[in-house]
């Protein structure tokens, strides 16, 4: 019995000891939790005294600050230095001691007081800290002043956009959130942003986004703003879906200029192209020749639209006419180099322009005595190919042949300029020497007065055939 009573007593003592320890521990926990969260001294009692080691171990980190910066410029900008006096968070906050400003009479001392509305007096510092409206008003600080950073963050407004309903968000280099923050499957827009970040060449960038305003008609296909907008220049698709309106795809009609898909098979009545119109658009020289031979007349409305063809036909205004030599159509004015010298200096404005001849005019009356004589292979005033040539006018150079003579240099080339048949060399009309578009007077001694010594060589070259261009007089 004694042994049983002793064991019961020991168990009872152990139970009481356990209960006492539990009560003491709970009271200690309550006392610790009742202590203030921010004690006066935050410095721990550790053997380390080097500030670099303490900062590296994280003992200098302030729980209130989000960015653990140690650079003095960054700390000064964020207001973490002891000497920094940050502006008031509240606009109308008043200083507790308003009377201390009465003790100061120096303007600099008054400006340094906390009761002063703005501690900074430099306009650049005021603009950087957000005092753009006035000293008594506080705006949120904007650390970025570079125009590229402002444009990237969406802080630049467009002139053609409504500023009431613009949604901006910074365009990050990687628009996809970290894996630790993704708690749901990605939607279509977020998948597009991921594809855009991986392959920016295939998907349009943020600068090519069309931002839609609420005041704009939702399905306005014919609105000029849809196509004149600076964001809609190259594409109507995507940007990061962070507070931005995703533009809807507008199915363009057949009149849309930027419609890159093929046109439908059904065409409207005014767009139907007849086969006759296609045949009428042919601009072949051979077809024109056949028409001229069949009709016996020349069409005045030329079908040619190429600038080279128009220049060869002489239909383009120019200071110096140089066409006709390389014409393949036979309609150009047939001017020789010797005639070209006098064309611009002739009083007749129609100099060098010749008339077409019809078939009855070309055919000479047939003598009944010559009926047995075969006709000549090439009729007069005609081309070997069958094209009718021009009728020479009275102001052309006189010659015996109906066709223009080739520019063969005479024995004395200078006599061609002295014996000008169009000029009456009197005292009232002095002699002139013509070279292209220049009109140079003769010297009083009777010799030519040359502006450049190389003119003689040029004139001598013009008198010989041009062997480098064998087809120059091919069709003339």
UniProtKB/Swiss-Prot annotation:
Valine amide PTM sites in chain numbering: 133
Alphabetically ordered keywords of this record: Amidation, Cleavage on pair of basic residues, Neuropeptide, Secreted, Signal
Acidic residues biased stretches: 286-297
Keyword Disulfide bond: no
GO biological process, one term: neuropeptide signaling pathway
Expression (tissue specificity): Neuropeptide-like precursor 1-1: Expressed in antennal lobe (AL), corpora cardiaca (CC), corpora allata (CA) and gnathal ganglion (GNG) (at protein level). Expression in AL detected in all animals, in GNG in most animals, expression in CC and CA in few animals (at protein level). Neuropeptide-like precursor 1-2: Expressed in antennal lobe (AL), corpora cardiaca (CC), corpora allata (CA) and gnathal ganglion (GNG) (at protein level). Expression in AL detected in all animals, in GNG in some animals, expression in CC and CA in few animals (at protein level).
Residues that make up the propeptide removed upon maturation: 160-232, 259-476
Any one annotated GO CC term: extracellular region
Signal peptide range in chain numbering: 1-34
Domain of life: Eukaryota
UniProt main location, coarse: secreted
Location of the protein in the cell: Secreted
Region (Disordered): 275-298, 360-385
Protein's recorded name: Neuropeptide-like precursor 1
Organism from which the protein derives: Agrotis ipsilon
Lineage: Eukaryota, Metazoa, Ecdysozoa, Arthropoda, Hexapoda
